[in-house]
């Protein structure tokens, strides 16, 4: 579950001293915030001058990587697992170098940020066992699509029961596509209750 970013700023409407950040954009050495008061619900935009530092960003999109230089606030802390937005694209941070590999760092100390795009479907590999052999296929699903062990899934005319979810941190009984490395299932007979993945299968 993603935590809502908050800043300490007094609401002009009710005086509440903490605001929720709805959107944030860095442009021309200024940070533009769209904030909402959790107390009265009023929304407003604020502008804050910030000191920027340059960092290299490497974005992974399937099997292709793109490298670019970005400006990030010097006093902002970035952590592995955070989601940042660059040129309208949502990117999940997977690695930070200062140049040492660290879990979190201030913008002024960061040299390289590695990330994966969340603005494109997640390419997921599935290993399916039909008793005589195991074969692999790929599907392209929304990043927030959730999979659960022991559920039955359908791809075209085939059905399989999900037996294992391999994630970035190990294994899980339930996980969203963005956190999954691979799925493992066994062929099963057709059932009445299933999740249809056919629209996400491209024949790979």
From Swiss-Prot:
Taxonomy, superkingdom: Archaea
Q: Which InterPro entries match?
A: Znf_CPxCG-like
Q: Which PANTHER family match?
A: UCP015877 FAMILY PROTEIN (PTHR42195), ZINC FINGER PROTEIN (PTHR42195:SF1)
Q: What is this protein called?
A: Uncharacterized protein MJ0981
What's the source species' lineage?
A: Archaea, Methanobacteriati, Methanobacteriota, Methanomada group, Methanococci
């Amino acid at each position: 579950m993603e935590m809502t970013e908050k800043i300490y700023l007094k609401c002009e409407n009710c005086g509440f001293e903490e605001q929720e950040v709805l959107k944030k954009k860095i442009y021309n050495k200024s940070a533009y915030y769209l904030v909402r008061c959790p107390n009265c619900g009023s929304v407003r935009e604020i502008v804050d001058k910030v000191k920027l530092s340059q960092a290299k960003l490497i974005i992974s999109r399937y099997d292709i990587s793109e490298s670019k230089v970005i400006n990030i606030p010097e006093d902002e802390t970035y952590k592995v697992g955070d989601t940042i937005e660059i040129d309208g694209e949502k990117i999940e941070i997977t690695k930070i170098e200062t140049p040492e590999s660290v879990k979190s760092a201030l913008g002024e100390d960061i040299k390289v940020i590695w990330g994966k795009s969340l603005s494109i479907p997640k390419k997921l590999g599935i290993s399916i066992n039909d008793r005589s052999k195991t074969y692999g296929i790929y599907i392209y699903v929304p990043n927030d699509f959730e999979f659960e062990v022991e559920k039955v899934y359908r791809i075209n005319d085939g059905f399989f029961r999900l037996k294992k979810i391999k994630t970035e941190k190990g294994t899980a009984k339930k996980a969203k596509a963005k956190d999954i490395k691979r799925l493992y299932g066994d062929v099963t007979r057709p059932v009445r209750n299933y999740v249809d993945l056919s629209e996400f299968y491209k024949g790979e």
